[in-house]
Design a protein with these regions (language model features):
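General small-molecule cofactor/ligand-binding pocket signal
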Residues: 24-26, 100, 176-178
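A Rossmann-like FAD-binding core segment of flavoenzymes
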Residues: 1-90
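A short, glycine/Asx- and small/polar-enriched loop/turn
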Residues: 36-42, 95-96, 190-195
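FAD-site-proximal beta/loop scaffold in flavoenzymes
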Residues: 55-134, 227-230
Length: 285
């Protein structure tokens, strides 16, 4: 799909939004060549399982990601870790005396995965604050990230925090994911729109592991993903999310907010899966 950072079920909603605005979406294609044709135009050649194709465009945007730039740090004696990023401790020290580092060039403490590399602006700002305070003699510690992200695609907003099910491999958990569709506010009040919410949790303990949300821009997607992010930071269970005292007025929400409706859906799915496991064990026994 267009937004591969989401599960396909939610990513397909983003793909549909792009197509709704008249754009052709070619996934599973490899760009094999880009060449100027004159007159400010560019010819782009692609290859996929369905064959080769070409198109002419006025503008070509190439997005190939980022990588850490570490030459200066390596020359100073710093060590490199995941993805070639600079190894730092929780105080953002590099191990080289009087040298701190922060941002996209350093490894990141992920509150679920441990040490990883997660180049995000929000993370960089927090790390920079920690590094600056400690340079001045402080004792600040970076509390860690849960990878919260949000993006606007035309009239749609997509967000995620924590882990998707396939990303939980390094953890000793029994991951379960449930997708729920819930309205952003009470349906009897005009303008209600659906949110598609995916919740991932540990089927054994109920611990929240991650969430994804896709919905219209008016539906406070960023606020709702931040609710899940806060719960992840505090190591809450999915049941704890259901118990949160969240704000409510009919134009803006429901007595059970959409995030809580999704959490309830996950709880029912987990209970059913656990009961099925018990029944299976009884049959085998």
């Amino acid at each position: 799909e267009v937004l591969s950072t989401l599960d396909p079920e939610l990513g397909s909603l983003v793909t549909a939004e792009v197509r709704r605005h008249g754009a052709a979406v070619l996934t599973g294609s490899t760009v094999t060549g880009i060449a100027p044709t004159g007159g400010g135009q560019w010819r782009v050649a692609t290859r996929s399982t369905s064959g080769d194709a070409e198109g002419t465009f006025a503008l070509v945007v190439v997005c190939v990601g980022v990588h850490p730039v570490t030459d200066l740090a390596v020359a100073a004696g710093a060590r490199l870790g995941q993805a070639g990023a600079i190894v730092v401790d929780e105080s953002m020290r590099t191990g080289v005396p009087h040298v701190w580092a922060a941002g996209d060039c350093v490894v990141t403490h992920h509150r679920l995965l441990g040490t990883t590399w997660l180049p995000l602006g929000t993370t960089a700002h927090k790390q920079g604050r920690v590094a600056a305070e400690n340079m001045l003699g402080g004792s600040k510690v970076f509390a860690g990230s849960v990878g919260t992200q949000v993006v606007k695609v035309f009239d749609l907003v997509a967000a995620r925090t924590g882990l998707r099910q396939h990303e939980t491999g390094p953890l000793e958990v029994s991951p379960l994911t449930r997708v729920t569709v819930a309205d952003d506010h009470k349906r009897y009040y005009p303008g209600a729109v659906p949110l598609t919410i995916s919740v991932t949790g540990d089927q054994s303990t109920g611990r929240l592991l991650g969430a994804q949300i896709v919905g219209q821009r008016s539906a406070e997607i960023s606020k709702r993903i931040d609710t899940f992010a806060t719960a992840l930071h505090a190591e809450l269970t999915v049941d704890d999310v259901i118990d949160l005292d969240l704000s409510y007025t009919p134009p803006l929400g429901s007595p059970w907010d959409a995030v809580q409706v999704a959490a309830q859906g996950w709880e029912r799915a987990a209970a059913a899966a656990n009961q099925a496991a018990v029944n299976q064990a009884a049959v085998i026994g």
